[in-house]
């Protein structure tokens, strides 16, 4: 028996092509797409305006299957984190951050991460595999369902109010994994987020965060430009080589040039640089002045992130006064600078704390133990 096709794996064009293979017209694909994403429906029998014969056919050959939630944690500040089973003993984490005027969903793109940034809990777990498009968009599908938002979002779309009154108004690809290392599946999910037959989010409200894979930044600019955030975290190559090892392949000069090129087509007129504040590592006044020189030709804003500790990280958070002074130097240079409010740290849902459950294929744990052995 053939494995059923998971329809969450398709963007609109892909679903139209798949339906064409069944001898069905494009409008049928769009009907099913709306039921899946705008109504949050995973039961073909409930798709009442779809022909009964097609519903019967779909039940035999297709499914609508998001990841399976295995744990639901709610922080004292209202942040909500789901642990989602993606098979073969792997699980990823998705975080919803409610605020007064918006709700942001933080989505994972990989089971683990191979980039091994020094201060990130996900990287310490190693890497297993890329998530499928269904597993990525399924996080938004599932969060809408669990938050009771699917039908509300559909009503907003019908009323022409695309961004008002939604529970999830913003999506950030800032969960587990490096999104641009899983380019094709991430872009399929992004297209669904943007498409009016699915979620209809504004490009300005969808953000991809990258550690700096330069060729993929250029490709994203050409294929699906959304808001871009760059995990910078260092003001010079020597320090960034240590904190963000991908810098050894794509150093800061190349990364800054890629950011300039991206802005030619970006929905926002600036790049967001994320900068984790590590006590005594990258938080000195000299680092701030190096940053000013580094980004002088890149319209940008800085988001300073107080480090969120995790076991055996080896780092400490910069104190509040040091962060305030660091931000002040950037602000005095005319750079918009914010300090991220830590959310969800009591359920390990804060930035840098997501770990999930990863069956490492990189032997990272073995290599780490070997490096710690007394020789």
UniProtKB/Swiss-Prot annotation:
Instruction: Name the job this protein performs.
Output: Specifically methylates position 2 of adenine 2503 in 23S rRNA and position 2 of adenine 37 in tRNAs. m2A2503 modification seems to play a crucial role in the proofreading step occurring at the peptidyl transferase center and thus would serve to optimize ribosomal fidelity.
Q: Please list the residues that bind S-adenosyl-L-methionine.
A: 177-178, 209, 231-233, 308
Q: Which Gene3D superfamilies match?
A: 1.10.150.530, Aldolase class I
SUPFAM superfamilies recorded:
Radical SAM enzymes
Matching CDD domains: Radical_SAM
Q: Which GO terms describe its biological process?
A: rRNA base methylation; tRNA methylation
In this protein, the active site sits at: 93, 351
Q: What class of enzyme is it?
A: transferase
One Gene Ontology cellular component term attached to this UniProt record is: cytoplasm
Q: One Pfam family this chain carries?
A: RlmN_N
Q: What is this protein called?
A: Dual-specificity RNA methyltransferase RlmN
Species this chain originates from = Azoarcus sp. (strain BH72)
The miscellaneous remark of the record is:
Reaction proceeds by a ping-pong mechanism involving intermediate methylation of a conserved cysteine residue.
* Gene for this chain: rlmN
Q: Which InterPro entries match?
A: Aldolase_TIM (IPR013785), Methyltransferase_A (IPR040072), RlmN_N (IPR048641), RNA_MTrfase_RlmN (IPR027492), rRNA_lsu_MTrfase_RlmN/Cfr (IPR004383), rSAM (IPR007197)
Which cysteine pairs are joined by S-S bonds? 106-351
Q: Which cofactor does it need?
A: [4Fe-4S] cluster
HAMAP family cross-referenced by the UniProt entry: RNA_methyltr_RlmN
**NCBIfam families in UniProt:** rRNA_mod_RlmN
Give the protein family. Belongs to the radical SAM superfamily. RlmN family.
* EC number annotated for this UniProt entry: 2.1.1.192
